[in-house]
Amino acid sequence: MKSNIRTLAPLLTIAATLLLVTGQSAQAQAWPSKQVIKLVAVFPPGGSVDQVARLLEQPLSQQLGQSVIVENKGGASGAIGTAAVAAAPPDGYTFAVVFDTHGVNPSLMPNLTYDSRKDLAPVVLIGTAPMVLATNSASEFKTFADVVAAAKAKKGASYGTIGSGSLGHLAMELLGKSAGMEFQHIPYKGGGPLMNDAVAGHVPLAIGSVFLVKPHVDSKRMRPLVVTTSKRSPDLPDVPTLAESGFAGFDAPAWWAVLAPAKTPPEIIKRMNEEINKVMRNPDIAKRMDAQGIDVVGGTPEAARVFIDRQMNIWAKVVKDNNIQAD
């Protein structure tokens, strides 16, 4: 009898595994069929993450034949909404739309309730955008070379960002450290207060996304000096890159991506990836993304994973080397 049990045990294990795999496969083939699909925008309404999520909402609903809704769950630089998605059932009905803070939060917030790499699966990289270093139009800084000269002088140069640990803050720390420049960081509580002071000349320099800065450039109240990406921005084609300005290889883009809970069936991630890529190939959607200063990227889940991992590694070193802490 014991011999028979020992013989049956491996067979039972194989059978259980086959049932599990078959169940997951059937679930993936039937997706989407049972409920609303949620896109969790991990920042409050009105910002770029919210707007990106809402650009995806209606086209995805039409393509999938299933209701897709945006749910805003902001706070802690996107960590609260991301934690909710990481803890959601991996059934293809909950996704996160995240910002570049997702690549920084693991280094700034050691007590996160989720593992950014293990508990979430990248679906697609939506797009990237340059950060823009700008100054008041009446400022003494006419070019980025003027900023470099001031930052290398005893007095240094002050700049404002949307907050400590933001991509703008980390990019300026990386820039200063790589070239022996001294910058004084002035953190603000968001883009609105930052740009109000920058336009008024209360802070000499401001760094923010194209989405944040360009309206003030268009109104002639701000002068753009340089962008932080390796290529010029189509939205600010006359503004040089840091690479062109003597800092070869410097590339610090803002970015947006869609993630799923880990263990979401690969077939569902593949399908969602294909559907989002299809949305972004729509000329009208691409035009609306461009209006926000976002350069559409798209691509495979694996390409998104490689990009996000690289961002996490880059900024983890900057945070550690400069002892940067979140607000």
Residue ranges and their predicted role:
Residues 42, 46, 100, 131, ...:
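Short coil/turn segments
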Residues 28-118, 155-157, 164, 180-205, ...:
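N-terminal (or domain-start) structured segment
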Residues 10-21:
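Bacterial N-terminal signal peptides
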Residues 22-28:
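Sec/Tat signal peptide C-region and signal peptidase I cleavage site
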Residues 128, 213-282, 310-313:
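C-terminal lobe and pocket-closing loops
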Residues 1-12:
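Bacterial N-terminal signal peptides that target proteins for export
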Residues 36-37, 87-93, 107-193, 242, ...:
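Hinge/capping helix and adjacent helix->loop/strand transition within the periplasmic-binding protein
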Residues 300-326:
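Extracellular/periplasmic bilobal clamshell ligand-binding domains
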